[in-house]
C-alpha cells in the first residue's frame, strides 16, 4: 500500500474533506502540483480548478475556487472559498452562471467588470467540467 498523508479541504462554511490519501493534485498559479506523502513543505496560491484526490488507488475529483494549499510534515490543507463534489453541483445553475458571465464579458465597460466576468466564467466552466466528469 502506498504511503498516505492527511488531506484537509476547508471552506468558510465547512470542512469539505478530511481523510488520509495517497495523492492530491491541484492547480497552482505556477501549474499543477502533485502532492504525496513527505512532500516538501510549502504554501502556494491556487487557481480555480479541480482537486484530484487519490485514495485506495482510486481518483475522485472536486471543483474548487481560488485559495491556498499548505503542505506541512503531518498534513496538507487546502483553503478555498468553495469546494463541491460532482453530485453537489447544480448543472442548470452553473449553465445559467456561464451564460450570465458570457453576456457580461461581451457588454463589459470597464476593466473591473471584465475581470469579474472572467472569474465568474472560469468558475462556471470549472463546475460544469467537474459535474460532467471531464
Swiss-Prot record:
Keyword NAD: no
UniProt membrane topology term: Peripheral membrane protein
Subcellular location field: Cell membrane
Keywords: ATP synthesis, Cell membrane, CF(1), Hydrogen ion transport, Ion transport, Membrane, Transport
CC annotations in GO: plasma membrane; proton-transporting ATP synthase complex
CDD domains: F1-ATPase_delta
Protein origin, superkingdom: Bacteria
GO molecular function terms attached to this record: ATP binding; proton-transporting ATP synthase activity, rotational mechanism
Quaternary structure and partners: F-type ATPases have 2 components, CF(1) - the catalytic core - and CF(0) - the membrane proton channel. CF(1) has five subunits: alpha(3), beta(3), gamma(1), delta(1), epsilon(1). CF(0) has three main subunits: a, b and c.
Similarity comment text for this entry: Belongs to the ATPase epsilon chain family.
Function: Produces ATP from ADP in the presence of a proton gradient across the membrane.
Protein name: ATP synthase epsilon chain
Amino acid at each position: 500500500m502506498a504511503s498516505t498523508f492527511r488531506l484537509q479541504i476547508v471552506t468558510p462554511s465547512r470542512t469539505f474533506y478530511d481523510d488520509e490519501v495517497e495523492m492530491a493534485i491541484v492547480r497552482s498559479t505556477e501549474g499543477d502540483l502533485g502532492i504525496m506523502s513527505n512532500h516538501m513543505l510549502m504554501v502556494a496560491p491556487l487557481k480555480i480548478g479541480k482537486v484530484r484526490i487519490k485514495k485506495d488507488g482510486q481518483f475522485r475529483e472536486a471543483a474548487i475556487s481560488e485559495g491556498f494549499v499548505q503542505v506541512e510534515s503531518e498534513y496538507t490543507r487546502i483553503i478555498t472559498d468553495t469546494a463541491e463534489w460532482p453530485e453537489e453541483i447544480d448543472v442548470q445553475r452553473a449553465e445559467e452562471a456561464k451564460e450570465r458571465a458570457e453576456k457580461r464579458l461581451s457588454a463589459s465597460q470597464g476593466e473591473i467588470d471584465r475581470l469579474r466576468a472572467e472569474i465568474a466564467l472560469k468558475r462556471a466552466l470549472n463546475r460544469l467540467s467537474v459535474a460532467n466528469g471531464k
